[in-house]
Curated annotation (Swiss-Prot):
Assembly notes: Monomer. Interacts with the heterodimeric integrin alpha-IIb/beta3 (ITGA2B-ITGB3). Interacts with ITGA2B (via cytoplasmic domain); the interaction is direct and calcium-dependent. Interacts with the protein kinases PLK2/SNK and PRKDC (via the region immediately upstream of the kinase domain). Interacts with PLK3; the interaction inhibits PLK3 kinase activity. Interacts with PSEN2. Interacts (via C-terminus) with F8. Interacts with NBR1 (via C-terminus). Interacts with FEZ1 (via C-terminus).
Recorded GO CC terms: apical plasma membrane; cell periphery; centrosome; cytoplasm; endoplasmic reticulum; filopodium tip; growth cone; lamellipodium
Record protein name field: Calcium and integrin-binding protein 1
Ligand binding (Ca(2+) 2): 161, 163, 165, 167, 172
Domain notes: The EF-hands may also bind magnesium ions in the presence of high Mg(2+) levels and low Ca(2+) levels.
Gene designation per UniProt: Cib1
Entry function: Calcium-binding protein that plays a role in the regulation of numerous cellular processes, such as cell differentiation, cell division, cell proliferation, cell migration, thrombosis, angiogenesis, cardiac hypertrophy and apoptosis. Involved in bone marrow megakaryocyte differentiation by negatively regulating thrombopoietin-mediated signaling pathway. Participates in the endomitotic cell cycle of megakaryocyte, a form of mitosis in which both karyokinesis and cytokinesis are interrupted.
CDD domains: EFh
Miscellaneous note of the record: The binding of either calcium or magnesium significantly increases the structural stability of the protein in comparison to apo-CIB (calcium- and magnesium-free form).
Amino acid sequence: MGGSGSRLSKELLAEYQDLTFLTKQEILLAHRRFCELLPPEQRTVEESLHTRVSFEQILSLPELKANPFKERICMVFSTSPTRDSLSFEDFLDLLSVFSDTATPDIKSHYAFRIFDFDDDGTLDREDLSQLVNCLTGEGEDTRLSASEMKQLIDNILEESDIDRDGTINLSEFQHVISRSPDFASSFKIVL
């Protein structure tokens, strides 16, 4: 990646800066990291901007490897019709949302989408159960019993479901998140 064809143009860098919460240096680092996932012959700027990287490759990045929501993160940010790969721009969008400079509203919107496992626009009992399992692990020693899970989800809904419809919508989720001072600082990925 040392040749003249291996750096993003000033115009493209400026456009990416305008469209994301990332600095020029962060965009260049993101491009370098993305290119490292590509075969050597696809590492030119032109190729890298038109090539998709499989989730398997993206998930090999140490920054995502240990995240319990890594598959959902990739699915939410993928623009692929089959939702199984990321383009460089998808990768930039992901890093932008998880950057320190992304707004709390943007972060909470994407957190909601990541936690909405069935993509129906609400967090229902099944979504909340999957969310808890991702956080606690699904091993015998960490998995909650059915009664513990029911009690926990009842408590979450009691606290969060303002309109009492049995689900948490985006505005209810954002209301809860707004009362969590650590959310924005913990919802980040740094390359």
